[in-house]
Amino acid sequence: MRKKYLLLFLFVLFASSAFSQISKTHYIPPITSNGSTAAYIGEQWIYISTPSVDQVVFTITDINNGSIITGEVKNDEPYSLLLSSDESSSGLVTPISEVGNTTNSNGYVINADCPIYVSVRFFATTSLYQAGAFTSKGSSGLGTHFRTAMMPMGNKTTTNLASDFTSYVSVMATQDNTIVRATLPNATASANIIGIPGFTPGTPLEFNLNEHENIILAVNPEAGSGNRRFALFGALIESVDASGNQDPTKPVAVTVGSGNGTFSESTGGRDSAVDQIVPIQNIGHEYIFIRTEGDDSRENVILVADVDGTEIYISNDTTPTETLNAGEFIIIEGDKYDGSSSGASMYVRTQGDSYPVFAYQGVGGPATPNQGMFFVPPLSEDAQDDIDNIAQIHKIGSETLSGRVSIVYKDGATIEVNTGEKVGGTYSYTPVDLSGITTNTVIGKPGYKTYQISGLEGDIQVKSDDELYVAYFNISGAASSGGFYAGFATPPAAAISLDLESLGACVEFDPVSGDYVFNGDGFKMNNPD
């Protein structure tokens, strides 16, 4: 029976399904590896979870060979899939010999009947020397304007290079005839962009991609070539039309990362770091970072400016630490946190919302090789998603790690953390006792607090009745991985006119058409904005 509705609603109505990284469609661009012994990628896994108590049907399409895997997932039955045991036979990993001017058809596309979370996790070799993970940002990750960063191999003045260090940017098209333009403001003539001979500084690179095709830009700065390590920092990745204007009808997905890398300028530990990032419309000018368990040299924050004259303020400072132009970046060392222990916080802002920055966080465990990188969401009143759930926080395949979550929340909000597991054939959630966990009040941003909770296993729920930002992190020996599961949000229109049939309860925004789609068929509501 057809009905017409005019809905005036708050964001929370569809927050968990329409406006965050939980999504019905996920694009997974490939990563790359230089094949070195320490960083050689072994097992690669996809983890899928959902808040739905009913079965959700999904498909995983391997772009490389066209194979399709169909599966089901529900809240008490998260799903995991071994993609490959070796990087040489993987649809996730593009060999370093095929990056640059070569257009590839690697990576994965995941479609589901209802919104799902997707994370990719991997480790390098069976000895767990290195590990990496990234969370798909779903529809929030699609756009036409991105700025990049990765592991810096030191700070701006001191290099800590290894001969097998690699950094990369991976871009996947969602539509045919997509023009990807990459502008590299920090690349010099000797930058050695792999697979692109004769690179000319200041001249953008352009690539023509069809649906699901991808391009990877990579650098391998060897010891003594320190200027190359920043070649891909601040890169402007755009989807443009034939006239060179950004083309909103052809959004792309972007992943950035490093292999055998480090944030430290002094220690010898190395690890992998990778994350999928979001476009300009989903970043902001205020951020809160939560320290993990590394030393100051590894607990870094990298901010990339998109607008000239961007002023960076730390904590409650009234004088900017640095002023950046578009494509420039700052590396903030760990001594700027309000403490040296895990759970300490750092508030960073610019002078206003007209000066957004792309934010990356270096994270670490107690051992010097334990390193990773998160792409961090901005503070936003629209970030009100519960996390339900992070699948098997302590696992990468058969390997067991120690799980943690970092939480930013509003003072006075109710926070609930639960661990889920099946015991004796019955699945249940058990509350985590938060009474003994120290909360941290954020200096410079009254009204916000942080938690860090360690020793977690199983499937993790995090719930709040206000803003919520959640990252997970796991470590084992020399390896670590993690990423944000909550915080990336797109504000909805205030009023939407619905002309619908009763087809279900799964609503999602389509960034290509600008419509809200119900169950993927038979229904859409036009977004007047």
Language-model features: locations:
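Bacterial Sec-dependent N-terminal signal peptides
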Residues: 1-23
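Intrinsically disordered, low-complexity linker/terminal regions across diverse proteins
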Residues: 21-520, 527
